[in-house]
């Protein structure tokens, strides 16, 4: 039997209308929809896709448990188990569409599965999605970077000082706001934030003074000198 193909599909930041035509077409033709959550109904990426393609609810769902932990051993076991589950479906000749938030190549746990499946010789393809930082700048109505400015995309593992010392524009993702906001005020930098970009509960904070310290997990700061 010919092996199936794995597609890693970015659904964008939250607005189902920001899903690309290719993402919609792949999801529509796939035999199996894989999601990075052991409880599919709680998966943000799947819920976004369902708003664009309600018929996905009739497809076979493959939940992949991706634990929120910093324990490297637990993560490696989860990645191995997730890749094995995907390969089992591919061995059955199924086309698998793995849905992931934003773009699959930007801080996505999908990549750890993709690497394992591709290394095992299975056909794979990554379908890009609209990154959250591009959608956030658009929602705020501001340029992300211009006039030769450097752009730094910074995960929450960086300290505020490390991030703010970088030149140009900084995008701070999933950061520690109670620690970051005082550092921002002291630096004199300009900052804006989008919480839950593209989702129904999206909130825009165009200035540093408006940014609350208790914003949610899906918050993104754009910092300019």
What are these regions (language model features)?
Residues 105-166, 212:
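Class I SAM-dependent methyltransferase SAM-binding "motif I" and its flanking Rossmann-like core
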Residues 44, 101, 128-131, 157, ...:
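Short beta->alpha linker loops
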Residues 66-72, 159-161, 199-202:
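A short acidic, often aromatic-flanked loop/helix-cap motif at beta-alpha or helix-coil junctions
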Residues 1-16, 21-122, 206-212, 219-220, ...:
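Class I S-adenosyl-L-methionine
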Residues 35, 62-65, 126, 146, ...:
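Structural signal for conserved beta-strand scaffold positions within catalytic alpha/beta enzyme cores
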Residues 6, 163-225:
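A contiguous loop/helix-start segment that scaffolds small-molecule binding in enzyme catalytic cores
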Residues 40-42, 69, 131-134, 199-201:
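Short gly/pro/ser/thr-enriched loop/turn and capping motifs at secondary-structure boundaries
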Residues 13-16, 39-40, 157-159, 174-178:
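Short beta->alpha connector loops
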């Amino acid at each position: 039997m010919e092996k199936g193909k794995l597609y890693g599909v970015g659904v964008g930041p939250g607005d189902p209308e920001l899903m690309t035509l290719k993402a919609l077409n792949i999801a529509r033709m796939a035999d199996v929809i894989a999601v990075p959550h052991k409880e599919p109904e709680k998966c943000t990426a799947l819920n976004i896709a369902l708003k664009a393609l309600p018929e996905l609810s009739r497809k076979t769902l493959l939940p992949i448990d991706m634990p929120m932990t910093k324990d490297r051993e637990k993560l490696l076991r989860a990645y191995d188990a997730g890749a094995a589950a995907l390969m089992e479906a591919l061995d059955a000749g199924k086309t698998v569409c793995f849905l992931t938030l934003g773009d699959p190549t930007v801080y996505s746990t999908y990549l750890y599965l993709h690497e394992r499946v591709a290394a095992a010789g299975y056909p794979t393809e990554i379908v890009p999605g609209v990154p959250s930082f591009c959608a956030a700048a658009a929602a705020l109505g501001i340029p992300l970077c211009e006039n030769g400015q450097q752009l730094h995309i910074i995960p929450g593992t960086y300290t505020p000082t490390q991030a703010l010392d970088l030149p140009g524009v900084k995008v701070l993702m999933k950061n520690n706001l109670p620690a970051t906001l005082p550092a921002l005020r002291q630096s004199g930098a300009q900052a804006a934030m989008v919480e839950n970009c593209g989702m129904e509960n999206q909130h825009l904070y165009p200035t540093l003074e408006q940014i609350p310290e208790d914003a949610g997990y899906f918050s993104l700061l754009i910092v300019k000198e």
